Amino acid sequence: MLEVLTVSIFNQERKVRIYLPEDYYSSHKRYPVLYMHDGQNAFGAEEAIGGVSLDLHKHLDQFKSDLIVAAIDQNTEGEERINEYCPWKHGDFSELLLGYKSGSGGKGSDYADFIVNELKPLIDRKYRTMSGENYMAGISLGGLLSVYAGCKYPDVFKRIAGMSSAFYRNQEEIEKLAGSTP
Protein backbone atom coordinates (compact mmCIF):
# COMPACT_ATOMS: atom_id res chain seq x y z
CA MET A 1 0.00 0.00 0.00
CA LEU A 2 1.47 3.34 -1.06
CA GLU A 3 0.76 6.83 0.20
CA VAL A 4 2.41 10.13 -0.71
CA LEU A 5 3.29 12.96 1.68
CA THR A 6 4.57 16.36 0.64
CA VAL A 7 7.29 17.98 2.72
CA SER A 8 9.34 21.14 2.36
CA ILE A 9 13.11 20.83 2.28
CA PHE A 10 15.58 23.48 1.10
CA ASN A 11 12.60 25.74 0.23
CA GLN A 12 11.24 23.17 -2.21
CA GLU A 13 8.18 20.93 -2.03
CA ARG A 14 9.22 17.29 -2.21
CA LYS A 15 7.30 14.01 -2.32
CA VAL A 16 7.93 11.33 0.26
CA ARG A 17 6.54 8.02 -0.93
CA ILE A 18 5.34 5.87 1.95
CA TYR A 19 5.05 2.10 1.75
CA LEU A 20 2.87 0.46 4.39
CA PRO A 21 2.71 -3.31 4.93
CA GLU A 22 -0.41 -5.03 3.59
CA ASP A 23 -1.77 -5.58 7.11
CA TYR A 24 -1.06 -2.05 8.38
CA TYR A 25 -4.70 -0.93 8.64
CA SER A 26 -5.99 -4.29 9.89
CA SER A 27 -3.49 -4.67 12.73
CA HIS A 28 -2.30 -2.70 15.72
CA LYS A 29 1.35 -3.60 15.27
CA ARG A 30 4.21 -1.13 15.25
CA TYR A 31 6.72 -1.27 12.42
CA PRO A 32 10.37 -0.37 11.82
CA VAL A 33 11.01 2.39 9.28
CA LEU A 34 13.43 2.34 6.35
CA TYR A 35 14.35 5.81 5.06
CA MET A 36 15.47 5.88 1.43
CA HIS A 37 16.69 8.48 -1.04
CA ASP A 38 15.74 8.88 -4.73
CA GLY A 39 12.16 8.02 -3.79
CA GLN A 40 10.87 8.42 -7.34
CA ASN A 41 12.89 5.30 -8.21
CA ALA A 42 11.68 3.13 -5.33
CA PHE A 43 8.22 1.93 -6.30
CA GLY A 44 7.05 2.59 -9.83
CA ALA A 45 8.49 3.09 -13.31
CA GLU A 46 6.10 5.96 -14.18
CA GLU A 47 8.18 8.65 -12.42
CA ALA A 48 11.49 6.79 -12.10
CA ILE A 49 14.59 8.25 -13.70
CA GLY A 50 15.09 6.32 -16.94
CA GLY A 51 11.71 4.60 -16.50
CA VAL A 52 13.12 1.79 -14.31
CA SER A 53 12.31 1.43 -10.62
CA LEU A 54 13.26 -0.92 -7.82
CA ASP A 55 9.61 -2.08 -7.57
CA LEU A 56 10.36 -2.34 -3.87
CA HIS A 57 6.70 -2.67 -2.88
CA LYS A 58 6.35 -5.88 -4.92
CA HIS A 59 9.26 -7.51 -3.07
CA LEU A 60 8.06 -6.30 0.32
CA ASP A 61 4.54 -7.60 -0.37
CA GLN A 62 5.83 -10.93 -1.70
CA PHE A 63 7.88 -11.55 1.44
CA LYS A 64 5.24 -10.01 3.73
CA SER A 65 7.80 -7.66 5.21
CA ASP A 66 6.77 -5.83 8.35
CA LEU A 67 8.40 -2.56 7.36
CA ILE A 68 7.36 1.01 6.62
CA VAL A 69 9.42 2.68 3.88
CA ALA A 70 9.72 6.46 3.60
CA ALA A 71 11.35 7.22 0.23
CA ILE A 72 12.22 10.88 -0.34
CA ASP A 73 12.22 12.13 -3.93
CA GLN A 74 15.45 13.69 -5.15
CA ASN A 75 15.83 17.31 -6.16
CA THR A 76 15.94 17.24 -9.96
CA GLU A 77 17.18 20.82 -10.45
CA GLY A 78 20.67 20.98 -11.95
CA GLU A 79 23.28 19.45 -9.64
CA GLU A 80 21.09 19.64 -6.54
CA ARG A 81 21.07 15.86 -6.08
CA ILE A 82 24.86 15.98 -5.78
CA ASN A 83 24.66 19.03 -3.51
CA GLU A 84 22.12 17.42 -1.18
CA TYR A 85 23.56 13.90 -1.05
CA CYS A 86 27.24 14.87 -0.62
CA PRO A 87 28.11 16.02 2.90
CA TRP A 88 31.30 17.75 1.69
CA LYS A 89 32.05 19.82 -1.41
CA HIS A 90 34.58 17.45 -2.95
CA GLY A 91 37.74 15.57 -2.18
CA ASP A 92 41.08 15.00 -3.84
CA PHE A 93 39.99 11.51 -4.92
CA SER A 94 36.89 12.83 -6.69
CA GLU A 95 39.02 15.40 -8.51
CA LEU A 96 41.37 12.63 -9.61
CA LEU A 97 38.48 10.49 -10.92
CA LEU A 98 36.41 13.28 -12.43
CA GLY A 99 39.38 15.11 -13.91
CA TYR A 100 38.23 18.44 -12.49
CA LYS A 101 37.58 20.10 -9.15
CA SER A 102 33.83 19.92 -8.55
CA GLY A 103 32.13 22.70 -6.64
CA SER A 104 29.08 20.51 -6.03
CA GLY A 105 28.08 19.03 -2.71
CA GLY A 106 28.09 20.26 0.84
CA LYS A 107 24.39 20.09 1.80
CA GLY A 108 24.40 16.43 2.90
CA SER A 109 24.65 17.29 6.59
CA ASP A 110 21.60 19.57 6.36
CA TYR A 111 19.72 16.89 4.42
CA ALA A 112 20.51 14.26 7.09
CA ASP A 113 19.44 16.76 9.79
CA PHE A 114 16.14 17.27 7.95
CA ILE A 115 15.46 13.53 7.96
CA VAL A 116 16.24 13.13 11.66
CA ASN A 117 14.74 16.37 13.00
CA GLU A 118 11.75 16.92 10.71
CA LEU A 119 10.81 13.89 8.61
CA LYS A 120 11.33 11.18 11.24
CA PRO A 121 9.16 12.98 13.86
CA LEU A 122 6.45 13.44 11.20
CA ILE A 123 6.56 9.73 10.28
CA ASP A 124 6.53 8.76 13.98
CA ARG A 125 3.44 10.93 14.60
CA LYS A 126 1.52 9.83 11.51
CA TYR A 127 2.27 6.09 11.54
CA ARG A 128 2.67 3.30 14.10
CA THR A 129 6.44 3.13 14.14
CA MET A 130 8.63 0.94 16.32
CA SER A 131 10.84 2.97 18.63
CA GLY A 132 14.55 2.51 18.01
CA GLU A 133 14.10 0.57 14.75
CA ASN A 134 15.11 3.06 12.06
CA TYR A 135 17.16 2.12 9.02
CA MET A 136 18.50 4.00 6.01
CA ALA A 137 19.43 2.82 2.53
CA GLY A 138 20.54 4.40 -0.70
CA ILE A 139 22.12 3.72 -4.06
CA SER A 140 25.13 5.60 -5.45
CA LEU A 141 25.17 9.07 -3.84
CA GLY A 142 22.26 7.88 -1.68
CA GLY A 143 24.61 5.19 -0.37
CA LEU A 144 27.21 7.82 0.50
CA LEU A 145 24.58 9.86 2.32
CA SER A 146 23.24 6.78 4.15
CA VAL A 147 26.69 5.88 5.48
CA TYR A 148 27.23 9.52 6.48
CA ALA A 149 23.88 9.69 8.31
CA GLY A 150 24.60 6.38 10.05
CA CYS A 151 27.90 7.80 11.33
CA LYS A 152 26.41 11.17 12.29
CA TYR A 153 23.37 9.63 13.98
CA PRO A 154 24.41 6.18 15.24
CA ASP A 155 21.76 6.31 17.96
CA VAL A 156 19.00 6.94 15.40
CA PHE A 157 19.80 4.53 12.57
CA LYS A 158 20.25 0.94 13.66
CA ARG A 159 21.11 -0.41 10.19
CA ILE A 160 22.53 1.20 7.06
CA ALA A 161 22.69 -0.11 3.48
CA GLY A 162 24.83 1.63 0.90
CA MET A 163 24.45 -0.02 -2.51
CA SER A 164 27.06 0.79 -5.13
CA SER A 165 27.87 3.84 -3.01
CA ALA A 166 29.50 6.81 -4.72
CA PHE A 167 32.11 7.26 -2.00
CA TYR A 168 34.54 8.72 -4.54
CA ARG A 169 32.81 12.10 -4.21
CA ASN A 170 33.85 12.36 -0.53
CA GLN A 171 36.26 9.42 -0.20
CA GLU A 172 38.76 10.85 2.29
CA GLU A 173 36.12 12.51 4.46
CA ILE A 174 33.78 9.52 4.71
CA GLU A 175 36.68 7.17 5.53
CA LYS A 176 37.80 9.50 8.31
CA LEU A 177 34.25 9.84 9.69
CA ALA A 178 33.52 6.10 9.50
CA GLY A 179 36.85 5.33 11.17
CA SER A 180 36.03 7.60 14.10
CA THR A 181 32.46 6.34 14.63
CA PRO A 182 32.00 3.65 17.29
Model-derived features: where do they sit?
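Non-catalytic cap/lid and distal C-terminal segments of serine-dependent acyl enzymes
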Residues: 1-182
